[in-house]
């Protein structure tokens, strides 16, 4: 209610204020995986009482912060032939859904019946 019209015009949906517990969980997840598949995003949203959109935007913003920090440290541009640490999966961010060990599913049989 103390917001100005100019602020509301620039931020029509409002700004999300994350709790410290939510931030801890989001940062932990980011440490393991910078890109979330939809399934994991839904799990995180339910776990943290946030929307999928809030999770998605938080990860986008966090990746930009990470990229900026790496650039400031001079780490982002590695010598030719060496890839930077943790690049996004091939085929787009949603192409691969890496499950954490607690959520792992049993592997399918590798042989085909004759």
UniProtKB/Swiss-Prot annotation:
A Gene Ontology molecular function term of the record: DNA-binding transcription activator activity, RNA polymerase II-specific
DNA-binding region(s) from the entry: 11-70
Region ranges (Disordered): 70-93
TM region positions: none
SMART domains attached to this UniProt entry: HOX
Keywords tagged on the record: Developmental protein, DNA-binding, Homeobox, Nucleus, Transcription, Transcription regulation
Record-given protein name: Homeobox protein Hox-D3
């Amino acid at each position: 209610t103390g917001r100005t019209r100019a602020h509301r015009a620039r931020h029509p949906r409002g700004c999300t204020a994350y709790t410290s517990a939510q931030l801890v969980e989001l940062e932990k997840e980011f440490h393991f995986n910078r890109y979330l598949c939809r399934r994991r995003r839904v799990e995180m949203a339910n776990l943290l009482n946030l929307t999928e959109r809030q999770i998605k935007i938080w990860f986008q913003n966090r990746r930009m912060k990470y990229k900026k920090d790496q650039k400031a440290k001079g780490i982002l541009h590695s010598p030719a032939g060496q890839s930077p640490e943790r690049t996004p999966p091939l085929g787009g961010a949603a192409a691969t859904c890496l499950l954490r060990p607690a959520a792992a599913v049993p592997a399918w049989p590798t042989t085909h019946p004759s």
